[in-house]
Amino acid sequence: MTKVTELVADVVTPLAEARGDELVDVEYVKEKKQYYLRIYVDRRPGGIDIEEIANLSELVSEKLDELDPDPFPEPYILELSSPGLERPIKNEKDWERAKGSYIHVSLYQKIDGEKTYEGTLKDLNQNQIVLEVKIKTRRKEITIPRKVIASSRFAVEF
């Protein structure tokens, strides 16, 4: 996380938690000459609806406007949303929540000739995950060292 996203996370986390929500991620990016501050929040169980996101957006906007000095070098567009069904797996809490779920994993280097896998997360520890994947018509467990995981997210199984 950058200093800006860390500061935003520090501001948003207590606001979200006070409402029973969870801060999932913060992104501060520049796209086509425009800055965007994207904040992803969720609520367990059942998720968060658009009205709740709109209410939280107003609270967050007010708090960010009060920051002094202003941490944003340029004007930006504030976007609050749910992370969706394919939410990223970013921290240990997310990994524990993903146990037994169908996930997508992208790797820095190939394992068994592949750089991406989708399957059910069967087990994990600090060093590795065990993923049950379907190869043609058979299921196989693959052990993936966590240090080679570039990104991971929940996935929808078809």
UniProtKB/Swiss-Prot annotation:
Q: What InterPro entries does UniProt report for this protein, alphabetically?
A: Ribosome_maturation_RimP, RimP_C, RimP_C_sf, RimP_N, RimP_N_sf
Q: Name one GO biological process term.
A: ribosomal small subunit assembly
Q: Does the keyword Cytoplasm apply?
A: yes
One GO cellular component term, please give it. cytosol
The reply to whether NAD figures as a keyword in the UniProt entry is no
Q: Which Gene3D superfamilies match?
A: Ribosome maturation factor RimP, C-terminal domain (2.30.30.180), RimP-like superfamily, N-terminal (3.30.300.70)
Cite the entry's keywords alphabetically: Cytoplasm, Ribosome biogenesis
Q: Where in the cell is it found?
A: Cytoplasm
Q: Which HAMAP family match?
A: RimP (MF_01077)
Q: What does this protein do?
A: Required for maturation of 30S ribosomal subunits.
The family line of this record is: Belongs to the RimP family.
The name on file for this protein is Ribosome maturation factor RimP
The gene for this chain is rimP
